[in-house]
Amino acid sequence: SNVIAGVRSAAAELSDSGGSAAASAIMTTDTYAKEAVAHGTGFTVGGMAKGSGMIHPQLATMLAVLTTDYPLEAGEAIEFLRPAVDTSFNAISVDGECSTNDTVILLANGASGVARTPETDEEFAASVRKVCGELAKHIVVDGEGATVLAQIAVRHAMSEPEARAIAERVATSPLVKTALYGHDANWGRIAAAAGSAKFNGGFAHLDPDRLSIAIDDVPVLVDGRPTGDEPPLTNGHCAIEIDLALGDGSANYLTTDLSYDYVKINAEYRT
């Protein structure tokens, strides 16, 4: 009865300007409301999301709702949403932890009346990707206790699935994440994590003598040999590029550091 009453109360407050209020209402440990928008030719895609901890692909405490006035037929939304989710919400991790209630929804009412063509469909797909990407980045930036946003790029892996496995392994490595918190350009931890990425019952291909790593565009390992250079990592952002020199596979991932505050937040949290 409380749920029904709550739904009725919320419905009574529906308005054209209610999006920001809704984005604030769904917050839990978030420190700010997360919204994004993309304007296409005659249509709009907007979105809101919540999430800060227990963020990892497939099952996490994340909610995202996208709305659009682009005309879609029943069942078509997934064709645009799934590819966008695969490169955004399914390519982020704050703590590698999972739950059972993540949701990404795309709602379309067709109110724009735009005449659909292959070109407008592609523009719409790009708009959905943009909104998903911005919301996913907001979630990582606002990760529980996060002080560093890390962008991980894996290049020239044996295949794209292997590149993704390596990127995810590095993104979820506690040793890599604590090194980020300590502003330590520790290529050894990155290489060790990459080399232990599980794939197809074994491990992703990696040749230590061909491995190169750059941190904030500074080469720290080239063909398996350390350069001795050490970027400062002091601006709250870190770009890690891992080049395996084995094939054409590539993948991108967003993650955070692991701080004292993350431990404090989750040690004090009670359900």
Language-model features: locations:
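A structural signal for small-residue-enriched, beta-sheet-centric alpha/beta enzyme cores
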Residues: 1-271
